[in-house]
Amino acid sequence: RLASRYTKALARSMAQTKQTKAVTPLVNGFTTFQSGDSTVLFSRSHPTIAGNVANTLATQADLNETSLEQSLIDIAEMTDERGLLIAAKGLKLVIPSALQFTAERLMASQGRTATADNDINAIRSMGMVPQGYRVNNFLTDPDQFFIITDVPNGMKYFDRSPIKTAMEGDFDTGNVRYKARERYVFGVSDYRGIYGSNGA
């Protein structure tokens, strides 16, 4: 019974570590985590031979109707290496738990939020974020939000060595040692696959 408890605790620890590592490109994407072009993951100046491409707001903003609409406009204006429009679209909003109520109002309300105007909710009626939103409890900044786009080969996860566990007993002391090992890496191939805001 004790062995089972320790094994479960080790498995939980490994899972917790993997989830924390998985959000590192997002959490640090505005400061230290770089994409393949040597700029930070979320930048207004990803260099191409035809000019710069942006995957973040010009002025960082909290999640609201204006910032979400501008993000979707910016995504639609993304270009390839030659400066040609690629007709990119947003697919899914990824948010910390602190923004789930804001996201629900923005995505599910029939009318516009935080206004007395009798306008429709264009984001909802136009299906601008078809896969809705997803709460990631491991995001550490309560203001950051991200949009997964339909550009292929964006964020990547490589499983280099699946998890392996082992245990052994010590004859002299009667102690039992447990260990677990796995190798993986999280990163990005094409920065156009994700769009982000660091919050105001």
Language-model-detected regions and their locations in the chain:
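Charge-rich, acidic-biased intrinsically disordered regions
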Residues: 28-47
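Exposed beta-sheet edge/beta-hairpin loop segments within beta-rich domains
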Residues: 1, 85-86
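Beta-rich nucleic-acid/ligand-interaction surfaces
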Residues: 27-34, 132-133, 138
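Sequence/fold signature of self-assembling virion shell proteins
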Residues: 42-80, 87-92, 98-200
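Long, contiguous amphipathic alpha-helices that act as assembly "spine/axial" helices in icosahedral shell
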Residues: 1-33, 93, 178-180
